[in-house]
């Protein structure tokens, strides 16, 4: 996403690198909250959950979850499975930002306008999210299975090998539909809100003011995106966590039917399991990504065009 509508354009490779650096920066700082989010989302709260072996540990909040993980499993567990999203992060975030810029150009041509409107920002963001989903699904599946409290995999490569052996190559794409829904809604909300917030704030005249505006816009965008996509993220986690050899009941398949199953069995609140750690990660994470991405783009712009 361009940090300034009047800024000189940069080739795709610069957008790709800027997005990759932004994503890896956010992941390194915020990953423990992603582990907490997954633990909450995989908690099944039906009366029969314990009987089918789904309820292993109950957590009473983000801090309680962090404490229990460190106490019972060790500090390193907070970063268990990070190698998979770390490998994913560069193409994921690069796709998010670079494809968003490319889709903006496509929609501007489609609607015969030179202006980036909020509708174009939302459409471009959602389209970039769906493209991003196709890239990240295998990495997401490995990450979810590694983060699960019941995980017995020796590492990401062990998880990858066993998944392919037991479920085939296509098993790595389990949950792609829910991932596309999740990413389209988050990206559409994130980029749409960033556009609106930036236009509503006083024009930044200094680098410090631009950074402030990006921090605020990114935080609000990350929060709105999280509110929109959390139910689909819960479904994605449930679908991807169950492997082919598991004894768990396989009742989560397609996205929308799974939403109804969770709602009927556990209530509306279950669709927002993990919302607090998720928003605690993605609100400041959204700010961090936007600031780093904008900073990297400005750095490359200075290199290419001079001050």
Swiss-Prot record:
Keywords: Membrane, Mitochondrion, Mitochondrion inner membrane, Repeat, Transmembrane, Transmembrane helix, Transport. Gene3D superfamilies: Mitochondrial carrier domain (1.50.40.10). The keyword Mitochondrion applies. One of its GO terms (molecular function) is ATP:ADP antiporter activity. Its main location: mitochondrion. GO terms for biological process: aspartate transmembrane transport; L-glutamate transmembrane transport; malate-aspartate shuttle; mitochondrial ADP transmembrane transport; mitochondrial ATP transmembrane transport; mitochondrial transport. It is a multi-pass membrane protein. Transports C5-C7 oxodicarboxylates across the inner membranes of mitochondria. Can transport 2-oxoadipate, 2-oxoglutarate, adipate, glutarate, 2-oxopimelate, oxaloacetate, citrate and malate. The main physiological role is probably to supply 2-oxoadipate and 2-oxoglutarate from the mitochondrial matrix to the cytosol where they are used in the biosynthesis of lysine and glutamate, respectively, and in lysine catabolism. Disulfide bonds: none annotated. It is found in: Mitochondrion inner membrane. It holds the Pfam family Mito_carr. InterPro entries: ADT_euk_type, Mit_carrier, Mito_2-oxodicarb_carrier, Mitochondrial_sb/sol_carrier, Mt_carrier_dom_sf. It comes from Saccharomyces cerevisiae (strain ATCC 204508 / S288c) (Baker's yeast). This is Mitochondrial 2-oxodicarboxylate carrier 2. Belongs to the mitochondrial carrier (TC 2.A.29) family. It comes from the Eukaryota.
């Amino acid at each position: 996403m361009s940090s300034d509508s009047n800024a000189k354009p940069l080739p795709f490779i610069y957008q790709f690198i800027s997005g990759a650096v932004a994503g890896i920066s956010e992941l390194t700082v915020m990953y423990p909250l992603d582990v907490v989010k997954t633990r909450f989302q995989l908690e099944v709260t039906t009366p029969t959950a314990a009987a089918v072996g789904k309820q292993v540990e109950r957590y009473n909040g983000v801090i309680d979850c962090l404490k229990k993980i460190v106490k019972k499993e060790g500090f390193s567990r907070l970063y268990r499975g990070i190698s998979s999203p770390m490998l994913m992060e560069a193409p994921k975030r690069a796709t998010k930002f670079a494809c968003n810029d490319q889709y903006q150009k496509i929609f501007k041509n489609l609607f015969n306008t030179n202006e980036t409107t909020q509708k174009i920002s939302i459409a471009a963001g959602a389209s970039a999210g769906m493209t991003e989903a196709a890239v990240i699904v295998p990495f997401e599946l490995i990450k979810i299975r590694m983060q699960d409290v019941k995980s017995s995999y020796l590492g990401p490569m062990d998880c990858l090998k066993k998944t392919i052996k037991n479920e085939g190559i296509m098993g790595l794409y389990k949950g792609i539909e829910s991932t596309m829904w999740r990413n389209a809604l988050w990206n559409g909300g994130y980029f749409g809100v960033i556009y609106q917030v930036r236009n509503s704030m006083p024009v930044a005249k200094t680098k410090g003011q631009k950074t402030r505006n990006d921090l605020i816009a990114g935080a609000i965008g990350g929060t709105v995106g999280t509110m929109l996509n959390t139910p689909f993220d819960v479904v994605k986690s449930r679908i991807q966590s169950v492997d082919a050899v598991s004894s768990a009941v396989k009742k989560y398949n397609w996205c929308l039917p799974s939403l109804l199953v969770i709602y009927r069995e556990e209530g509306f609140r279950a669709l927002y399991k993990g919302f607090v750690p998720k928003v605690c990660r993605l609100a400041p994470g959204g700010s961090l990504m936007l600031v780093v991405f904008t900073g990297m783009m400005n750095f490359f712009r200075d290199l290419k065009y001079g001050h």
